[in-house]
Amino acid sequence: MSLPSPLLPVAELAMQNAQQSGYLEHWPQALITQFQFISGLSKFVVETVQRDAQLAEGLPEMLAQESRQEAYRTRLAEQLQACHDEVAGHRVLRQFRNREMVYIAWKDFTQAWSLEASLSHLSELAEAMIFETYQWQYQLCCQEWGTPTNAQGEAQPMLIIGMGKLGGGELNFSSDIDLIFTYPENGETQGARRSIANAQFFTRLGQRLIKALDQQTFDGFCYRVDMRLRPFGESGPLVMSYAALEDYYQEQGRDWERYAMIKARVMGREMYPEYQELRQMLRPFVFRRYIDFSAIQSLRRMKSMISSEVRRRGLSNNIKLGAGGIREIEFIAQVFQLIRGGREPALRQRGLLVTLEAIKQLQLLEEAQVCHLVEAYKYLRRLENLLQAMADKQTQTLPDNELEQLALAVAMGYSQWQALQNDVQQHMAKVHAVFVTLIGDEEDEVSPVERHFNELWDMAHNPEVIEQILQNDLACQNAATMSEQIIQFKADLAKKTLGPRGREVLNRLMPKLFSAIFADADAQFGLPRVLHLLHNIATRTTYLELLDEHPAALTQLVRLCTASPMISEQLARYPILLDELIDPQQLYNPIALDAYRTELRDFLARIPEDDVEQQMDALRQFKQICSLRIAAADIAGVLPVMKVSDHLTYLAEAIVEAVVHQAWQQVAEKYGEPTHLKDREGKGFAVVGYGKVGGWELGYNSDLDVVFLHDCPVNVYTDGKKEIDGRQFYLRLAQRIIHIFSTRTASGILYEVDTRLRPSGASGLLVCPVDAFEEYQHNDAWTWEHQALVRARMIYGDEHLASEFHRVRHQVLAKPREQAKLQKEVADMRAKMRDHLGGKKSDRFMLKQDQGGITDIEFLAQYLVLNYSAEKPKLTRWCDNVRIFETLIAQGVMEEAQAMLLTQAYTTMRDEIHRRNLLNLDADVALDKFVALRQGVSKAWQEWLESSTI
């Protein structure tokens, strides 16, 4: 710990003065060495120690303590208690502050602790001084004017809200403090000769508090107090009641005030039961329930004003306000807090470092980017503290003076100024790169949108001009129709209450939107769909700002809406899904098949389990988000049709599991659980998926065909306060499951659920005992029910029930059957279905129900399983048609060529149905489409079922 020669004269002079004062005689040598080092770096430490003999004498004992913050308040309170006038109190406050600041500076310059410890001590010291000064002055004011009370006579406190770095627990060395004063209720003082209003009492108290901390005396000052963040700023009252504060933030609160309020913290809050009421009141203003993308533009405007100030004042070397400085790191963190804090509790923390950690955990930024930000923040904050501790001055501008530059470099551990400057520039460059990527840079020269796209919006009241632009400049074939659509859209918007901000955003957005739409060859499809969506969200400015601020989201919106009216309608109905368009990589990359359950659990974990309504909404939102990603990947060609169905099926299974869990909790809370479960794991309950979900073949609009099973014996009851029969419990459970699935909330329904495939159909038990299910399948089920069983599998349930179901299914499917009878029954059922559902469009081929279509292939696969499983038991293994045909080849039942043709026909027609679903089109095609495949299917049908009805 040595000083370079240019700094030695200053240090030697300080040491001479110290030796003359005599206090070094009592210091250990190690401390003297440290003092000599610090004397070359910090004028503040030297002058404070020389001026305060009591400090100089007690410094060795102080510095031997690793931490002092725990005792700040008790020690200061004791000293203030003895002060009966302002002069004495002000002196105590300033001496206390200076002594503790020397301790902190000493630890900083000798690198004896972490940045976090330094910031914590600085923040705790400020809070202790604010709160104990308030307590001292409150007592004096009560003696003079009485105690402020509410209508019930209860004493009223003044709560002091610390803003900015003070609130965040990250105060810098020579920071000012931003405060807001408030009190719970209006009323009058009691106990004095003359009462005054609470507002008057607290205003006087606030003025005295500010004076005690801010006024310059012989001993200096404590903190510069800034009250400009209060409602109405300098023109507003110094103190406001809770009610007035709430009215202001609800009606007039501005974006920058939301930004400022993120770090707000009540000083000494543990002393006030009234704190919780204030916290609950302010939270909705700061953290919106919806994803709030307006924050980006607001923060960008603030950054623009700051940058202008930097240029105007020539603050080019400012490590706080300059490009890549501390403020940009704060903005990056607070963008995510303001946008997503309403939905992500982890983002509601005040401290910047813990917020960055939450951003990393939520994967909102790349891990490397967060690491750069954390490293830069710690580096720049340490540099800022040392810079300010040199002379106890509030500055973030790097010095021009060479001696000061060298002192700062040495304090930071460098031997040369240039090395420090290089590292500062590297850190700030990395920060600015992240900032520009996320928030944008007002310095960037953005290429103007082509003139005709601006005119297309500006001239939307003039049909001739619009049509000319569409026809001549954009070469649109349907110019007249599109012109009408644009003009009508703008006319409709004129009737809506958009507000000035909404119209401003819309005017910026529309030319960009037209540019994206007309870049696509299918613009005539995209334009009406996107305009319809915008019409639905026009009054919700945050969504317009999302599209305006994120070109990638705008591009994906146009692409998806142009490709699929199904998606455009989904986005228009549930605009919360627009959030998914921001990151194309995530949008076109659906969740891994084996991760749907985990992702859903994590998605639901943020919502209290007892909040049934929010849980139901969250289930629907998760399904919509995942379905959007699957459809986007489908459109992009990332997923083939079978993989699309796999994803939709695994998604449905994850949701079934979550719904059963929710329903179980709700029913068990009321009735307890069936007692036969006490000595075993699981719920004794199963959901069997039939049809498309059973065969891993779900489509975008598929229902869920399910059967509920349980293994509850008779004469079993529940163990709750309200006891019911065990089988009645499972009935209530199934009813609750169906309710959760089918209830229409603000986010729609979850799935249409069909339980008619249960034993005895709609007249049978809603939940069937597994032994009764087995008996029914063996003795009473029709052939078509056994056909349905081919495509049935357990999608939720205990291992025991799964084993039982698999056994029953295998035994039933592998029963010997009379071939001729089976052929006739299968063919007859198919003929009935075709008569009822097929051939409704004589000029079109219905992909599912017409001859040679998907249902023929499914019936053929089911017939072959039922007919040959007795001698080929492996045929019962699979529930999906593709693997059934593969097994038929492997077992020698069907020739490979025929099986491959049927598989190709099946997947091709399913693919077409998927595509037409995305386009909101019926599942039919022209009669000349898929002719060869249809003929192959019909030929196979004739060969295997030999029925005169075909």
Swiss-Prot record:
The EC number(s) this enzyme carries: 2.7.7.89, 2.7.7.42
Entry-linked Gene3D superfamilies: 1.20.120.1510, Beta Polymerase, domain 2, Glutamine synthase adenylyltransferase GlnE, Nucleotidyltransferases domain 2
Reactions the enzyme catalyzes: [glutamine synthetase]-O(4)-(5'-adenylyl)-L-tyrosine + phosphate = [glutamine synthetase]-L-tyrosine + ADP; [glutamine synthetase]-L-tyrosine + ATP = [glutamine synthetase]-O(4)-(5'-adenylyl)-L-tyrosine + diphosphate
GO biological process: regulation of glutamine family amino acid metabolic process
Key words of the record: ATP-binding, Magnesium, Multifunctional enzyme, Nucleotide-binding, Nucleotidyltransferase, Transferase
Any one GO MF annotation of this record: [glutamine synthetase]-adenylyl-L-tyrosine phosphorylase activity
GO cellular component: cytosol
Necessary cofactors: Mg(2+)
Adenylyl removase: annotated span: 1-443
Signal peptide feature range: none
NCBIfam families: PRK11072.1 (NF008292)
Assigned protein family: Belongs to the GlnE family.
Protein name: Bifunctional glutamine synthetase adenylyltransferase/adenylyl-removing enzyme
Encoding gene (name): glnE
